[in-house]
Amino acid sequence: MGNYSTNISDNQWQFIKKSLDLGNRKRKYSLRMIWNAIMYLVKTGCQWRMLPNDFPKWQLVYYYYCKWANAEDFDLLLSKLRDKERLKRCQNMEPSLGIIDSQSVRWGNNRSLNGYDGNKKVKGIKRHVVVDKNGFLLTVMVTVANVYDGKAVELLMKTLFYFLIPVKVILADGGYRGEIIEQIKNKFGYLIKVVMRNDDKKTAFVPVSMRWVVERTFSWFDNDRRLCRNYELLMENAENMVKLSAIKLLLNKI
C-alpha cells in the first residue's frame, strides 16, 4: 500500500468504523483501503479508472462509494464528525445558526448538465450550501449554474429539514430576498436573515460579519482538485464529492 498523504490514520479509521458500524468481517481488500482510495481521488481529482495500482480495483472502490452514498452513510459520518468537533470547541452539538450561499463552478465534463451564471460569468454548475458558524457543512445541493439562489433555497431547506438539523436562524446575502423568506419560515420554521454590505463607507475591504465563514468553506473545497471543476455526470455525485471533501477536512481534526 502506497504511503500517500491522504491515507487515513489509525484513529481516523477507528472513528469511521465505529460511526458506520463496519464490523470486522474478513475481506480480500480491507474497507480502510477503500476509504484511502476515495480520499486520494477527492484530493487529487483523478478519474476512477486512473486510481493507482496500490489501491483495490477501481470497480470495487466505486461499488463501495455507491453503496455508502445510497445508504446515506456519508451524511451520517459527516454529522458525527461535525458533532465531535463542535463538542471539542465547547459548543452545542446541534447548531442553531446557519449561513447559506452558493458557488458557481466551471464544468469539466461535456456530457454533464450545465447552465450559465450571468452574474459570475461561469458556465457549469452551482453548489448551494448551508454551513454552521465554524464553516462546517450542514447540507449541500447542486444545480445547473443558471438556477437563481432564491429558487433553489426551498429545496435546500427541504434537505436541511430532512436531516433534522435544528437551525433557527440562517444568514444570507441579497440573493435570498423576497417572499421566499416568509414561505421558508411558514413551511420549515427557519428564519432567513439577509445581511447586506454597508456600501456607504468607502473604506478598505471589510468582510461581512459571519457571512465570510461560508466563503472560507468554498476556499476549503478548492483545496481538493476534484471540486475545482465539476467532472461529475450526475448531480448526486457532485453533492457526494462535496460531502467527502467536508468529511476529509473534519477527519484531519481528529
Predicted regions and their residues:
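Short alpha-helical elements
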Residues: M1-I254
